[in-house]
Curated annotation (Swiss-Prot):
Annotated GO MF terms: ADP binding; ATP binding; phosphoglycerate kinase activity
Protein name: Phosphoglycerate kinase
Keywords: ATP-binding, Cytoplasm, Glycolysis, Kinase, Nucleotide-binding, Transferase
UniProt lineage: Bacteria, Pseudomonadati, Pseudomonadota, Alphaproteobacteria, Hyphomicrobiales
Protein residues bound to ATP: 202, 324, 354-357
Amino acid sequence: MTFKTLDDLTDIAGKRVLVRVDLNVPVKDGQVTDTTRIERVAPTIRELSEKGAKVVLLAHFGRPKGEPVADMSLKAIASAVEEILDQRVYFAADCIGDKAANAIAELNDGEVLLLENTRFHKGEEKNDSDFVTALAANGDIYVNDAFSAAHRAHASTEGLAHHLPAYAGRTMQAELEALEKGLGNPKRPVVAIVGGAKVSTKIDLLQNLVKKVDALVIGGGMANTFLAAQGVDVGKSLCEHDLAETAKAILAAASEAGCAIVLPVDGVVAREFKAGADNEVVDIKAIPADAMVLDVGPKSIEAINEWISRAETLVWNGPLGAFEIAPFDRATVAAAKHAAARTRAGSLVSVAGGGDTVAALNHAEVADDFTYVSTAGGAFLEWMEGKPLPGVDVLRQRN
């Protein structure tokens, strides 16, 4: 590891530790409906609290565009953080200035304070030097535990690391270690599964992966675009016909790099997209003109699972079919269960991420069996695309 972690933080009793966390959680009727992101950062907060630090939490919530917006106040999140930490969490009505400074001054060692939404100030997203200085005035040490915001060069995710001694929190550390195993320095063969609806949202990802993995499984609606580019009639299936040349270029790049491309050989088709819709399995070259492919078929599942069996490392982003609606979840569930079984047996390093992917693995009831499941969304995708992550790079540069 080329960055400092909490293992390097000793003798911090009484020190003001600014901790960047991800509290951008879903809220309905004033209640947090999914506490996963809070649970992920809880170990870092607890550890710093137990070491006697004055723990000061920095976070954003929503997109208030640099102005205070009542509905986007972090005050509504404080009680959910309290519940998960099982300790009092104080709240300050601003993240800089007197309100923040006074609240921090009143903290006892080991206590936790949540500052107001950093995005209530325009300087946050601009990474403005005056705003960074104002944030830094409230801390002695900076800990970044928000990998999910690491692809943004904002004041609280990147700027602060230039002003204070900077460390990776436990979530950041776990994420980076898992990603290093996934694509940084993986055990081979490496197989990637990329699914989801559209090729257009994952062009950079596919172009990067074909240079790094031994086999690329393409599923979901995006597989139709590749099949159509090869002359297959995909009927009424979701398909970006205008990206045929892009698909061909990715296939050519894969061939040149020695990366096997695994496309469906059969599909589960239906005339309507609803639960329990009449459906049939057809050869991929015999899709009825009035039907749409909503999942890959049993022969394709067999081929995908064979690749998973050969793999030492699996990187997964996106479902293989319309998993939200039965019976079009079969391929995703079958592949997920097979990958989970090999991971449990110690034969596979499995790293997965992206919103739909997490939901799909939870649906298959195997998320806990994967080596690592990232909740980071955009940052996970940009890492898979081979793009720099400012919030990570600055931790490496500083140490």
